[in-house]
Amino acid sequence: MDIKVGICGASGKMGRSIIKVVHADKDLRLSGALEASNNPFLGKDSGVIAGIGSLGTNITDKRDLFFNNLDVVIDFSSTDAISENLKAAVELNCSYVLGTTGLDNDLIDLINTCS
């Protein structure tokens, strides 16, 4: 089995931890790493950022490219990015796991609507 995983908020503390977990699991393949357009790690290899060496998956801010051909997205990005990430996942029939905290009622309503 080869589950293609994408991580939103890939350069943050949780994102880096998830990169390590995905890399260590033989059934998972890191297929995307997404960050905000002002992130200093854009274009860098996600494995290098996570401290495990090159994985060949660079951090991008291009949501359309990121969501291309993923099975599941794990989102630990900011509350500002959740709405667009969730909408893209739903549109592309991609499973979506949200770990971001501090959600307001509007985001909770959107999550419930998309569930």
Which role fits each region the language model picked out?
Residues 1-91:
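N-terminal glycine-/serine-/threonine-rich beta1-alpha1-beta2 phosphate-ribose binding loop
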